[in-house]
Amino acid sequence: MTLSILVAHDLQRVIGFENQLPWHLPNDLKHVKKLSTGHTLVMGRKTFESIGKPLPNRRNVVLTSDTSFNVVGVDVIHSIEDIYQLPGHVFIFGGQILFEEMIDKVDDMYITVIEGKFRGDTFFPPYTFEDWEVASSVEGKLDEKNTIPHTFLHLIRKK
């Protein structure tokens, strides 16, 4: 099993505001699709509800304490330990509580750094490059649909 974080955050580590992304960046959505298609996304219930439906062509797993939660096309787990039973490449997809719980346990992180400061009420936990090696850093292309500077980072935990 490979365990990765997949997240976009701004320069203040904001990941959300009122259960929505504070920015619109189609490049990042394509990046998420490219990385996670054919694999497993694990997210909390609030993150799933902000998306509104299972993402196609990948396994969608929702971690929730709500034993009555049931959505077609979604597998439900009720504990962090259940994540370790999932096969293949598993991406931790948010939100804040799940990221806080898993950041010290993942092998690597795929981070889209949004080069701006946005209003937010949900944050990615602090991390330092002392703990992570930069495997790749690619500037996102700007165009009429992608107007916010952004960088795609792949960080691997230092041994």
UniProtKB/Swiss-Prot annotation:
Any coiled-coil regions, as ranges: none
Keyword field contains NADP: yes
Enzyme Commission designation: 1.5.1.3
Gene this chain is encoded by: folA
Keyword NADP: yes
Catalytic activity: (6S)-5,6,7,8-tetrahydrofolate + NADP(+) = 7,8-dihydrofolate + NADPH + H(+)
Organism: Staphylococcus aureus (strain MSSA476)
Superkingdom as given in the UniProt entry: Bacteria
Binding site for NADP(+): 7-8, 15-20, 44-47, 63-66, 93-98
Name of the protein described by the UniProt record: Dihydrofolate reductase
Alphabetized CDD domains for the sequence: DHFR (cd00209)
Keywords associated with the record: NADP, One-carbon metabolism, Oxidoreductase
Pathway: Cofactor biosynthesis; tetrahydrofolate biosynthesis; 5,6,7,8-tetrahydrofolate from 7,8-dihydrofolate: step 1/1
GO cellular component, one term: cytosol
Gene Ontology molecular function, alphabetical: dihydrofolate reductase activity; NADP binding
Binding positions (substrate): 6-8, 28, 58, 112
Residue ranges annotated for the DHFR domain, each copy included: 2-157
GO BP annotation list: dihydrofolate metabolic process; folic acid metabolic process; one-carbon metabolic process; tetrahydrofolate biosynthetic process
UniProt function note: Key enzyme in folate metabolism. Catalyzes an essential reaction for de novo glycine and purine synthesis, and for DNA precursor synthesis.
Family: Belongs to the dihydrofolate reductase family.
